[in-house]
Amino acid sequence: VETSIGTLNFTDGVPSRDTADKVYDFMDTSRAAEAFLQGMPAASLAALIEGAHSLGAVEAHQVMLFDNLMNAKSLFLTGNSATVYVVPDLDLKRDGPTVVDAPDGLLGAANDGCFRFITNLGLAGKYLFLPPGYEGDVPEGYTVFRPKTYRVWVFLRKTPKNKSPEVVAQAAQEIREGLKVYRLADAANPPAMEWISGTDEAFNTIHYNNAEFYHHMNKVIQYEALGLLTPGVRGLFASLGIEKGKPFNPDDRMKAILADGVAIGNAQARSIVWYPRIDKNMAGAQIYPDTGSAWNMAYMGRNVHFNGEDGATMNTDARVTFHYPYTAVTPAMAAPREGTGSDYAIAFLDGDKKPFDGSKTYKITLPKDAPIANFWAVTIYDTQT
């Protein structure tokens, strides 16, 4: 039988040993590529947390704050230089039930360890996050959430009226005075908050894009609850030797296959992002459909769960289109309601459907009378980071 991987030989339907070996190489390589795409959300969130930890924001009350805005020294998949970001992360395995006491005036949300939306934190209040399987007492006075994972990433931002140093400093100070993060066990006497500045710091929050990705995912899987991944995705990683409670020691053959698989997975992700198949499963990607415009939505069809029109069919390409270049999941980022909502338009190609070239000059034409209540920004990102 002639195929794209060569000639496959059978006798009475039984494959030859050489054919079986060839097929297994194909199976393992394709599974490695798919594992890269399926594991990307978890790897990306873990990398965000590890980036903050590298600056010293390790304990619950140690929180990274971009007190003088973000700049290109810090490697983030997304972010802008117009808002003051503060990004607590919670470790419910280490700390048990944990409280985020949020003030008024912040916008943001909490995501679990696989970048699934948990809740918005747009209103002042005490948000209590319980570990998976928690059966202890739950005190009154909290808004309670039970994420599927031990790790929870919280992203909050405050928008200063302008970017003058005084106004930005005031916004950062209001965050310092209002936001508290602590273990529920310390609720009677929470430790003083420690603010770690992320501004002008060179550190990385982007997940691995080489074969180290699989070792990183093994570390995440070993630490996390089973709810991190679906049974099917857990099985996918197990087929590569990555399974909770077991060592991951790929032999030379598998090392070569993983290196090949992650390279193919990267190529898949970049192809999906730059050239979405809008005539097929990415038909809802365009901001201006039927116009030939290159502007696309961050969330295909403004669906932050990527679960299709019926709410039950996962669009894996739509999920890759978001998680490969972006971070932070909340319905509020795909709700263009005038006066209260927000929306994002992304262009990976110019008006002629060609990749942007840093040696050329481009012009953006904005729609007339676009509704802007809080702020708007145009942000340029590096195609590699």
Regions found by a protein language model. Name each.
Residues 1-385:
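A compositional/structural signature for long, glycine/proline-rich flexible linkers
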